[in-house]
Amino acid sequence: MNKPFSASILTLYPEMFPGPLGHSLAGRALENNIWSLETVAIRDFANDRHHTVDDTPSGGGAGMVMRADILARALDHSCEKHPDLPVLAMTPRGYPLTQSRVRQLSEGAGAIIICGRFEGMDERLFEKRAIEPVSIGDYILSGGEMAALTLLDACIRLIPGVMGKITSGEDESFETGLLEYPQYTRPVEWEGLSIPEVLRSGNHAHIKAWRQAMAERDTRLRRPDLWERYRSVQASRPLARNKKDRNEK
């Protein structure tokens, strides 16, 4: 039997977990041992009576910075228990989180996740430990806990056995490089608007074509960055196929 997906969370606020992940699909999966969760209280690794984990920023500036020595002790503790897990740090200075990276993580054994606070973490931690900095968007949160919950939710729902239908996640936004097509359900008529006729036609080919067209339209209008990337990938595919055909001849 495969080991459950393991999440080890380094945080100043262990009581924030599992939070919303204790409910719905993720909550049932946690109860059924499809994934496991542990929290590591960073303050437990401070060595003064006040459990201080931060200090003023070198060079001046507002706020406080999380200390590398204390974070490293907490991280080393978690890595000893989970030597095979990748280490991620939630920070607005990180690499953008993508659906492809989420899928990679969901197919692995789990992750150790460091939740940043204050003005951030001492940069020397990243220089001395193998840590992947991750950002969930171009905005600032009060701390990395909400970002960690978001990352975990995105991963957990892709673990086999969590979502009811095997193909449930395959047509969602970002899985194909596009935003997902619009969704409708009963009633057929609502406030003068009808469900598009094509979706009620029963013609699966027409429905598929309509959904593709709508996904492309919405991506082009709402996410021009994704649209340009999608067009680039689509344009390169015929070239790749032609090269493969020539090599096989």
From Swiss-Prot:
Q: Which coarse location class applies to the principal site listed for this UniProt protein?
A: cytoplasm
Methyltransferase: is it a keyword of this entry? yes
Q: Which InterPro entries match?
A: Alpha/beta_knot_MTases, tRNA_m1G_MeTrfase_C_sf, tRNA_m1G_MeTrfase_TrmD, tRNA_m1G_MTases_N, tRNA_MeTrfase_TRMD/TRM10
| Keyword Methyltransferase assigned | yes
Q: Which reaction does it catalyse?
A: guanosine(37) in tRNA + S-adenosyl-L-methionine = N(1)-methylguanosine(37) in tRNA + S-adenosyl-L-homocysteine + H(+)
Source domain of life is Bacteria
Q: Which GO terms describe its cellular component?
A: cytosol
EC number(s) on file = 2.1.1.228
Function field: Specifically methylates guanosine-37 in various tRNAs.
Q: How does it assemble?
A: Homodimer.
UniProt-recorded name of the protein: tRNA (guanine-N(1)-)-methyltransferase
Its lineage reads:
Bacteria, Pseudomonadati, Pseudomonadota, Alphaproteobacteria, Sphingomonadales
